[in-house]
Amino acid sequence: MGKRFTEYSQFDLSQVNKDVLKKWDENQVFAKSMTERDGCPSFVFFEGPPSANGMPGIHHVMARTIKDIFCRYKTMKGYQVKRKAGWDTHGLPVELSVEKALGITKEDIGKKISVADYNAACRKDVMKYTKEWEDLTHQMGYWVDMKHPYITYDNRYIETLWWLLKQLHKKGLLYKGYTIQPYSPAAGTGLSSHELNQPGCYRDVKDTTAVAQFKMKNPKPEMAEWGTPYFLAWTTTPWTLPSNTALCVGPKIDYVAVQTYNAYTGEPITVVLAKALLNTHFNSKAADLKLEDYKAGDKLVPFKVVAEYKGADLIGMEYEQLIPWVKPVEVSEDGTWKVSGKGFRVIPGDYVTTEDGTGIVHIAPTFGADDANVARAAGIPSLFMINKKGETRPMVDLTGKFYMLDELDENFVKECVDVDKYKEYQGAWVKNAYNPVFMVDGKYDEKAAQAAESLDVALCMMMKANNQAFKIEKHIHNYPHCWRTDKPVLYYPLDSWFIRSTACKERMMELNKTINWKPESTGTGRFGKWLENLNDWNLSRSRYWGTPLPIWRTEDGTSEICIESVEELYNEIEKSVAAGFMKSNPYKDKGFVPGEYTEGNYDKIDLHRPYVDDIILVSEDGQPMKRESDLIDVWFDSGAMPYAQIHYPFENKNILDNREVYPADFIAEGVDQTRGWFFTLHAIATMVFDSVSYKAVISNGLVLDKNGNKMSKRLNNAVDPFTTIEKYGSDPLRWYMITNSSPWDNLKFDIDGIEEVRRKFFGTLYNTYSFFALYANVDGFEYKEADVPMAERPEIDRWILSVLNTLIKEVDTCYNEYEPTKAGRLISDFVNDNLSNWYVRLNRKRFWGGEFTQDKLSAYQTLYTCLETVAKLMAPISPFYADRLYTDLTTATGRDNVVSIHLAEFPKYQEEMIDKELEARMQMAQDVTSMVLALRRKVNIKVRQPLQCIMIPVADEEQKAHIEAVKALIMNEVNVKDIKFVDGAAGVLVKKVKCDFKKLGPKFGKQMKAVAAAVAEMSQEAIAELEKNGKYALNLDGAEAVIEAADVEIFSEDIPGWLVANEGKLTVALEVTVTEELRREGIARELVNRIQNIRKSSGFEITDKIKITISKNTQTDDAVNEYNTYICNQVLGTSLDLADEVKDGTELNFDDFSLFVNVIKD
């Protein structure tokens, strides 16, 4: 009879990976997993689109494993799970990569390279690493349809985006505004608030800060009695001081006037600042010093508070312009301008605090949203420049430097600019990070930039010399950085299009409460708080490669149209041609057919720049309309994927409207997407469809190195996923990542952990299968017989099947509740603790030799069922080895007629097979065994050495009954002759209690000493009560003090000849005295083990009979003679002889002697 169950000579999960992939590919298993579920309920999954212009990393394995787990699980549960891959192809990552490759900057586009050629380069670059992404996806076993992905640059995808924008436009949720926005000079575009709130965007930076002195024009009398009067205002961005036009105070805040000296110049001054911050800027030790005694250079600068005010008392006071390079101007609607006289005064602001600074805020309306708002409310002008085009611009240009004089309007320069003062600073970069001199070979030299003198330092030195700086110091503060360039952002006035997301904020919050967030805290915390503080969505991007904003406007802005489809644009172009604004319709010229939604038809056109920029439309009153030049936020692209991936509403309208493919039942991405993709999905769904976009979401944590550091090429701590999979296979990697910590926790990735998983879990499971296959093939077991009825199976079989069904129930619940870590750990514990280390170990003899009895059949059927079920339970997490194991089992038995485990049904638990009382009894056996084996290890007594007795104090009859039922099993496992039960209070074992001061200290405080003394004096009866009830009331001189079992450590004292262990309510004592009789039996057992090892290393078949010869030795001869028959029976020996000399024998070394054994086949 041939072998039916495959047996392996080695365990190679990397090869398993390759073999199973080949099988999947040849049998189109992924496609079948969907087609065979036609007509079944749908489980809707959305794939967040990665960008293929960057290599995939180990963190992508984590995110994709999580997605794959639940898609596979739901498929096995009978759902049809379609999963379409996608590519995020627009935006800054692509553009910056292309700029670097071409050696250009944004300013070169349209000059050194045409927009068409530049965008063609972007289109090519964005798919650069597609093959690597496809390879990793394939190798790691992530099933997603990469043959038909959605691609965000596709014209049909863009058309859906236009349709969505039109819906927002119709609802009045799309508007244009000139407001202060986060702006990235390095990227050359504005940023949305959700981009600015990506993890890592806000960083602690060490900058030069200044408390500037603003000289008063009309001081109150008491302010002018000592030196020159100043307002003090603190800033972390001294480069904005030349743009200052106001100071802001809190009307209800208390302020003080302080007579003192400038520490740098020694000049007498009177300064005004918040009373609460007085001690921040003045040394209290100097409060009693006389002003007249001060000498320039003294470390202690005297000060004297001479008056107090409310902020409201200061409003309206005027001061001199701090850095009078440029005069502020007022600009009328027709573009004419005049010098303004309304600036440089104190204004109110409710947002002013006394947490830091001086309680007076320096206002530069062109560089701060709050600044702009309070200035506008108070009629304060912004400090603008007028360029040669007549446009009003901040003092800093879009590249991050002060405007050059020759870029400005000549009349403006003549009337408003102090050329002598300003020319020294024209062209100065406000932050060294923007200066191209610090870009070396396309990389930012951050160290060099930080080492060089900054504009902040230069301005502070200038102010210091002019008696305008009260204090200059380095300060660490949190500052936003661009999510793609890693360089600081500015807050800058921009003409931008916005989505009025704040209008739907309440509804977004309401719908968010219906989403199942894993973890829940992300939904209520990070995401929920984000929604509570929502800002309008800055949609505009001043770039080239992206989805064009589909809005055309007249020059005066009186008419506009938002285009929702290519067909509408086609028809509007026809009107424009008729009006004479366009010579012909480019879409008609290229043969585009409106309403025909084929790929070939849409490939005839291109909806990107520069082609849409060339289209001029006509307004209803006959004026030309040009497209607003902006692109839209790339995050809108990805947030629209539920609709755009199916070209909604132009195609597939019914299946989305009927909610067949929407909303998603489940999505998953990294925690960095909480305010990215998760938000944009939710925002668009709420604003357009009044719906959630997803019902459940897992936001997985970061994958860090083993020391908790972020992985990066620079730190040389990044892990290559390809080499890792090649070495270990995907399964150990996936299992390690999922079971090491919950997906939403950060993972400290340690490559050694993969090897541990491979050995401990997969190795154990492989060995268990190998054991089964070996003996099943010997006995010809093929599972053709009817199942042995449960009632007729031995208790140990009924126990493991009960535990197995409990496992099915618990694992199914875990998967269903998106708790993969719990599921994996449950499976691992079952395989290691229950199946391998307990069931198989206890039942080996049932599989060895002998007749094919019902008992042996029950053992085979039970172990087979366990292996097949474990394979199915683990399949979502470790799809490769699960499939291999399942195939090896079912090919031999023919029990499941499916080509892959991933087409099989997920196991269903059978309640009638679960016996909790039996599980409790066996758990007791396992617990006692574990404790006794630990005691053996403590004194280095091997399990093969029999011992006389275990003594167990029992708390009650139920505990005693549980142990009695498994008494023989325990005795056999720990190799003792007897188990004795004693009354827990019989005094045989003495228990003690030790306080945990960290827990009890906070509870009892000053009473702790008395509590500790009372605990030390607790009687055995009191300790028993504490163990039984979990708490005990101590008597402290008539007062009651209740301690809990968790607050103390209960332990047992060893007694002579015995070792004692205690865990919870269970205590065991092991007699460790080895008598001569026990020693002989131990030697016999040890010889059995050594001879079995010789059989194995000699390559004998398990059925081969042997002859044994052992060299004589006074230490072992008695044992060999006494246990001759026992030894032979155990090792299939036909004879066992003692000899004075054994030639060609194997040397066996014992603790203090050695002997030789010869084993030959009979």
UniProtKB/Swiss-Prot annotation:
Show the GO MF annotations. aminoacyl-tRNA deacylase activity; ATP binding; isoleucine-tRNA ligase activity; tRNA binding; zinc ion binding
A GO biological process of this protein is: isoleucyl-tRNA aminoacylation
Where does this polypeptide localize?
Cytoplasm
The positions making up the signal sequence are: none
Q: Does the keyword Protein biosynthesis apply?
A: yes
Q: Which reaction does it catalyse?
A: tRNA(Ile) + L-isoleucine + ATP = L-isoleucyl-tRNA(Ile) + AMP + diphosphate
Give the main localization category: cytoplasm
Motif 'HIGH' region mapped to chain: 50-60
Keywords of this entry: Aminoacyl-tRNA synthetase, ATP-binding, Cytoplasm, Ligase, Metal-binding, Nucleotide-binding, Protein biosynthesis, Zinc
Q: Where does ATP bind?
A: K713
Cofactor dependency: Zn(2+)
Q: What is its EC number?
A: 6.1.1.5
Q: Name one GO cellular component term.
A: cytoplasm
Motif extent ('KMSKS' region): 710-714
Tagged with keyword Kinase:
no
Output the superkingdom of the source species.
Bacteria
Task: Note the Pfam families from the entry.
Answer: Anticodon_1, DUF5915, tRNA-synt_1
Subunit comment for this entry?
Monomer.
Annotated function:
Catalyzes the attachment of isoleucine to tRNA(Ile). As IleRS can inadvertently accommodate and process structurally similar amino acids such as valine, to avoid such errors it has two additional distinct tRNA(Ile)-dependent editing activities. One activity is designated as 'pretransfer' editing and involves the hydrolysis of activated Val-AMP. The other activity is designated 'posttransfer' editing and involves deacylation of mischarged Val-tRNA(Ile).
The record's domain comment reads: IleRS has two distinct active sites: one for aminoacylation and one for editing. The misactivated valine is translocated from the active site to the editing site, which sterically excludes the correctly activated isoleucine. The single editing site contains two valyl binding pockets, one specific for each substrate (Val-AMP or Val-tRNA(Ile)).
Q: Which family does it belong to?
A: Belongs to the class-I aminoacyl-tRNA synthetase family. IleS type 2 subfamily.
Entry protein name = Isoleucine--tRNA ligase
Q: Which organism is it from?
A: Bacteroides thetaiotaomicron (strain ATCC 29148 / DSM 2079 / JCM 5827 / CCUG 10774 / NCTC 10582 / VPI-5482 / E50)
Q: What's the gene?
A: ileS
